């Protein structure tokens, strides 16, 4: 996506180096009518000398990077987990509980893919075995005791459940959990159980016993507090939906049915994957969300309550928990998804424009997105021009933007197998970000590709940074230029090194879909500067506005298969987007653009 004076261009499937794209825009008076231009010219080599050491290779590579990229990456296992659960238990009175928790990785789609990843690479829990030197050998109870949770039990062949007091008997699992952010003090507390996914090949007949348990590869675990039924920790390697469901099935069967107690889970609201995670948990049967502590929403397992009712309540709670931030709930129906996919599948050029909010609202207050031919522009094979919002256009017509990545842009060897990947490019992110320097930016932008629908938006923190620089006027343009340059140049180079698939296979497609989301979700200014070997301290001295923003995430992104529009009861998908409001952007100073949704 490339932006000019009063123009917004969206690029095609290939990422492009900012240093190779011509800048057609120069800073203009921000008060000029319909002005959406920005000086996005990358700093030249003389400018970079202010920030790059003379012996660094970055100063030349930044301005001479190739325009066309080749992306290559070998599948590898991720590090030990970052979790979706929160330790802030509300009524739970464990003194060692902490508020801080990391985020869980993106969810994957099938058990078959998860088995491929496990068989082709070491599990994230596959840590060197350690001998236990304890003198007392515990005795394991392999039968259920009435009204009690068993000390050790194998459930559904691939899952083991045992008391945490025996954790030190399993060196590999113990070492793996020790490397996480789970509070060590809780590991010696005996009123907890561990539920673990065991990697077993289909033809493996080795029985799972306390003696053989630690010889298996392990790639999923839940830590459950017995007294309250609270899931304190949850992780699945590559976050397979199937494995997560099986782990929860085991808890529902062994804990809920045996003890009769409720199962609770705490969600950390700062989790970068919260939309995907809560959707999974709600679909599984977790309901009745309530705020129980700082940045913590608690849900209870109760599969009979309608899923959508719970999702709507979570969105409402999340919206009210954010300060000086408005939000909007939208619904993209199946018929609109079919229309968008037809532009991906049937044309060899890009289309782009806006998806207006219709006058129709769902019972929960979400606005239904529609289609207006007058808001859609036809582009070229690798770009599309989207006119900026005009004064005569209503606000609800231009809140949500979109553009297509047609299947024709992909190479012929992938089209024949249906293995097409055209994710958001660094130039797409450039244009989406640049809009926040001008009135009425897109609150969210949909990128329609053969593999599915990508949804990109700026985090509230990145919105605040750009809006603050915008308010400083022309004096801030060099700072803005440098920020955008390092973000998109680092994106370009990381794509170049990580995501090149000459022939896309189901396995490489799955890895790229996961890794693209991971890369974009975890972008921060500090990581971008470090990746390009540019000392951030020198830049911060001349651009003090970025102080406090070095480690904030820049983007939110989600990926949705086209098939998912038919899989849900409403035959469509709900989205919630958050925005910083002020007079310049034109968005209202109210807590929600959808009145009913905020009640």
Swiss-Prot record:
Residues 11-20, 118-127 have a biased composition (Low complexity). Coiled coil: none annotated. Transmembrane segments: none annotated. Residues 46-56, 89-114, 128-138 have a biased composition (Acidic residues). Residues 1-10, 24-44 have a biased composition (Polar residues). Residues 1-146 are annotated as: Disordered. Belongs to the IIV-6 229L family. This is Uncharacterized protein 229L. It comes from Invertebrate iridescent virus 3.
């Amino acid at each position: 996506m490339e932006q000019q004076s009063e123009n917004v261009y969206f690029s095609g499937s290939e990422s492009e180096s900012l240093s190779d794209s011509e800048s057609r825009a120069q800073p203009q008076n921000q008060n000029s009518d319909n002005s959406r231009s920005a000086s996005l010219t990358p700093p030249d080599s003389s400018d970079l000398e202010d920030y790059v050491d003379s012996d660094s290779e970055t100063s030349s590579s930044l301005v001479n990077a190739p325009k066309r990229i080749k992306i290559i990456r070998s599948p590898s296992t991720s590090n030990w987990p970052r979790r979706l659960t929160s330790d802030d238990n509300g009524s739970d009175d464990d003194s060692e509980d902490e508020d801080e928790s990391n985020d869980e990785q993106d969810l994957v789609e099938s058990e078959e893919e998860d088995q491929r990843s496990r068989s082709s690479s070491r599990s994230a829990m596959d840590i060197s075995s350690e001998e236990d030197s304890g003198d007392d050998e515990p005795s394991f109870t392999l039968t259920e005791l009435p009204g009690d949770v068993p000390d050790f039990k194998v459930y559904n062949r691939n899952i083991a459940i045992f008391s945490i007091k025996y954790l030190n008997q399993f060196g590999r699992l113990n070492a793996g959990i020790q490397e996480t952010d789970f509070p060590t003090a809780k590991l010696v507390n005996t009123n907890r159980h561990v539920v673990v996914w065991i990697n077993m090949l289909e033809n493996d007949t080795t029985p799972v016993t306390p003696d053989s348990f630690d010889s298996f590869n392990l790639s999923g675990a839940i830590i459950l507090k017995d007294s309250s039924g609270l899931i304190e920790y949850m992780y699945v390697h590559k976050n397979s939906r199937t494995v997560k469901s099986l782990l929860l099935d085991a808890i529902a069967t062994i804990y809920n049915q045996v003890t009769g107690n409720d199962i609770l889970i705490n969600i950390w609201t700062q989790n970068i994957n919260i939309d995907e995670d809560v959707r999974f948990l709600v679909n599984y049967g977790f309901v009745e969300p309530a705020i129980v502590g700082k940045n913590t929403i608690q849900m209870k397992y109760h599969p009979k309550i309608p899923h959508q009712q719970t999702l709507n309540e979570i969105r409402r709670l999340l919206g009210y928990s954010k300060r000086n931030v408005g939000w909007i709930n939208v619904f993209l129906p199946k018929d609109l998804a079919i229309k968008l996919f037809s532009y991906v599948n049937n044309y060899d050029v890009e289309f782009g424009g806006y998806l207006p909010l219709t006058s129709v609202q769902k019972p929960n207050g979400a606005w239904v997105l529609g289609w207006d031919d007058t808001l859609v522009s036809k582009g070229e094979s690798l770009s599309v021009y989207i006119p900026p919002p005009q004064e005569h256009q209503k606000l609800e017509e231009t809140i949500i933007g979109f553009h297509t990545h047609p299947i024709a842009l992909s190479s012929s060897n992938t089209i024949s197998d249906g293995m097409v990947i055209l994710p958001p490019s660094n130039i797409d992110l450039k244009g989406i970000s640049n809009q926040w320097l001008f009135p009425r930016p897109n609150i969210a932008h949909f990128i329609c590709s053969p593999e599915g629908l990508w949804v990109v938006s700026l985090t509230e923190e990145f919105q605040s940074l750009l809006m603050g620089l915008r308010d400083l006027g022309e004096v801030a343009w060099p700072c803005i230029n440098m920020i955008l340059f390092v973000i998109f140049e680092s994106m370009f180079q990381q794509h170049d090194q990580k995501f090149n698939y000459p022939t896309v296979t189901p396995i490489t497609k799955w890895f790229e879909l996961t890794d693209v989301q991971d890369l974009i979700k975890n972008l921060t200014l500090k990581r971008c500067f470090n990746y390009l070997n540019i000392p951030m301290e020198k830049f911060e001295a001349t651009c003090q506005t970025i102080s406090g923003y070095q480690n904030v995430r820049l983007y939110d992104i989600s990926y949705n298969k086209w098939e998912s529009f038919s899989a849900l009861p409403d035959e469509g998908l709900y989205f919630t987007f958050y925005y910083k409001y002020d007079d310049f952007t034109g968005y209202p100073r109210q807590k929600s653009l959808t009145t009913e949704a905020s009640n």
